[in-house]
Amino acid sequence: MNKIKSLFAWLWQKFRAFCTWYKGLYQGRAWYTKTLVALASCIVAFILYLGAVDINFLWLFGKSPGYFSGILDPQTSEASEIYSADGKLIGKYFNENRTPVEYDEVTPDFFKALVDTEDERFYKHIGIDPIGVFAAAKDALLHHNGRGASTITQQLAKNMFRVRSQYSTGLLGKIPVLRLLIIKSKEWIIAVKLETVFSKKEIITMYANTVDFGSNSYGIKTAAKTYFNTTPKELTTGQAAVLVGMLKATTYYNPRTNPENSLARRNTVLYNMVTHGDLSKDRYNELKDEPIKLDFKVEENYDGQAKYFREAVANYLKDWCKDEGYDLYTSGLKIYTTIDTRMQKYAEDAARKQMKQVQQNFNNHWSIRRTQAGKGNWMGQDPWQDENHNVIPNFIQGIAERQPFYKALIARFPNNPDSVNYYYKEWVHPVKVFDYDKGSITLNMTSEDSIKYMTTFMHCAFVAMEPQTGAVKAWVGDIDFDHWKYDKVTAERQPGSTFKLFVYTEAMNQGLTPCDKRRDEYISMEVYDKKKHEMTTWRPSNANGSFSGDSIPLKSAFAKSINSVAVRLGQEMGIKRIIETAKKMGINSPLDDTPSLALGSSDVNLLEMACAYSTISNNGKHHDPVLVTKIIDHDGKVVYEGPTDSEQVIPYKSAFLMQQLLQGGMKEPGGTSQSLWGYVGNYRDTEFGGKTGTTNNHSDAWFMCVSPKLVVGAWVGGEYRCLHFRTGALGQGSRTALPVCGYFLQSVFGDPAFQQYHGKFDKPQDSDITRDMYTCASYAPKPKVDTTKVDSTAFQEEIVLDDEGNPVIREIPAKKAEGEATGSATTEEKKEKKKAKPTEQPINFDDL
């Protein structure tokens, strides 16, 4: 304590001595000496003040950037760019849409106009322009509307270091007048620091990259794209003058919202160039009469191609950015992805083409009509029905109550349900809704009808992947991103029979082959019902409602998607073992240890399924899906490279035999994937295999297709599981999901640019594999009387071309196709057919 008192006493003594000395400079001196002393004192005091501001003396002035922590490594918010595998910029992630450019990438006219208008002594001062300061002060005193005193370097300091917001103004900054003085002082200090570190060319380039041009356009590159759809290098003299003119007031001189103001300001900038010798008088006279021609488009985060994929990439990189200290929206990364823009367009076109037809079928199926205006412009049956085909009460009301507009009505009329119902059910107003032809249309309708309108759209997802690399080449998350942002590629739905891949793969793992047989017969077993919390009897049936009773080769059972055989195999191989195999092949979703898993009762997502099917195409080697190949930071350094490793997760023999089974879906009689030939039949140099899947009540329709170098998958269904077709003729995977894959494959394999995807599966590379394991007679059912009610087997199918040359399936009545054989049944046989019923018995594996 005594030492502190001694220190203050010493300081006070020195201060008094300084005051005595300073007084001596004035006493008895001439007036001019006193004047010089006063001026010198002001200069010294000002320098000391600036030093105190810079070091934040006694926390009075707030933090300022230092040389090493800020000036030498300035941090600006830069947009991260995302590129496709074929080198196209497909989008950006940004808070401020800014992409930096180099000095040589900007037209010289822009820099000339900028200096001539904003800072004519830019190349002469050191960050602060004393002449400009005094001129601005004089104009302010005389109430003239002169130019500002800030130099380009000072404006750069303000833009880059945000001294008005990012750095506090300390304790003294709470006083309004002092706050302004502190802010300007910091701008001067930072400007001088910038001038000592960077060249004039670097400073003016940094300014061009950081300045705000309005309309969410930060930096010259984004501004040139936004207002004129061009690059900074290709800006004309007039366009450059327009952009420079906006810097005085981006709203008042905006060429889109205030074209007259912008035109006058542009001509002022051009005249400044004339007065400084950077533009001839004749050229000025030509340009000043030209109108401003805009090609205006504000770039948003969601603009560009492959919107669902880009959102998936953002999620894919979330943890990586957090761990590595990057911000996806401000760090200026260049992200190189696996997507191919040409394949992506083929995928989007295929999805839209097929889903438009699916929607027409759905509307006709439920008698849905969508009129153009007024109350009740949505008409039809209510398709939101439970498994017993009963309309779900208050289904639309429940959706409405979760919407912001309905919550706002409740808040506005808390005790007035009549008013809420009026605005919800009666009030007709313009609503923007989806339309296949126009993308988006505005209809006059009630809020209730708008929910019905949008809810009854069918949805889809599609993904294409290279099995050898895991590279995702196309990704369609739904029919339209602007109206449905929820990505169905990663949404979990029941896969139906496409899950049989894992049942049969585990069977191959345990030594079975495609030519081994299992019986197709009635099954009954006791299982635990999670909903009812009790044991119940489960009786899985085949798609056609009947059982042949025959022993069927596994290749035929898989191709025809016979449920009874899949359930028997599931019990024989063990559900736990099947789950383990599915996990190894790429399924990460939780799977229930229940007999129905063999028929795809647990939810998975499309990306997982494509990854798992890729494991088969890749001869048993698993590769995680790859969305990003590399990332380069704003300094040009590679900071991330995508995974390239793969792991052998199932034996090669099992993978080869599964390739044969999948091809059987197209080659075997009655194979559920045969209609794919209508799309890829011309590409005989490539082998294809496929598996369809349809869940209960046709809520989910799937198709997975494999080839040696490309795997694709599609899902089709309603936003809610209660929205679906009522018949397999319209709702099964081969009718809804398969054509999405078919149209895509037709386009890709018909494009010479993708010749690398053509090819056939490898010949057996394992001496343990013999032809008799997978080459055997196909199953041919014996003619006999049906013992159950028949639905889908009442028709046979053939593939024909419609009027536009597109492959479609045409049903042929079975009697017509079979001729006399079917029509020869006697009356007694018909009666016997009605009487016969399957005998219920517990499952028995002794005869497997």
Report the location of each language-model feature.
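A penicillin-recognizing enzyme superfamily signal
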Residues: 337, 341-357, 391-466, 475-476, ...
